[in-house]
Amino acid sequence: MGRGGGMGNPVNVGIAVQADWENREFISNISLNVRRLFDFLLRFEATTKSKLASLNEKLDILERKLEVLEVQVGSATTNPSVFN
């Protein structure tokens, strides 16, 4: 005959509690690592945007300088007396 309404074997309950704590710890570690990854990605995005904006400004400056040089070369080829 079995016992009715009991909590079951104390060893099984202890194993279940231990497994539950291990699962909670695992989930906590996963959550922490996901949060760290998310924080890293936010910082990476901000840094990347900043660096790309800086590079874009430098590229704009170089493009303007190139346009000026193209105009100077064009006027020099049509008017060689500029170099005399």
Swiss-Prot record:
Superkingdom, taxonomy of origin: Eukaryota
BP terms from Gene Ontology: actin filament organization; cell motility; regulation of actin polymerization or depolymerization; trichome morphogenesis
Compartments reported by the entry: Cytoplasm, Cytoskeleton
Tissue distribution: Expressed in expanding leaves, embryos, ear primordia, and roots. Very low expression in mature leaf tissue.
Coiled coil: 45-79
One cellular component term from this protein's GO annotations in UniProt: SCAR complex
Classification via Gene3D superfamilies: 1.20.5.110
Function comment: Promotes multiple, actin-dependent cell polarization events in the developing leaf epidermis. Involved in regulation of actin and microtubule organization. Part of a WAVE complex that activates the Arp2/3 complex.
Family: Belongs to the BRK1 family.
Subunit structure: Binds SCAR.
Protein name: Protein BRICK1
Gene: BRK1
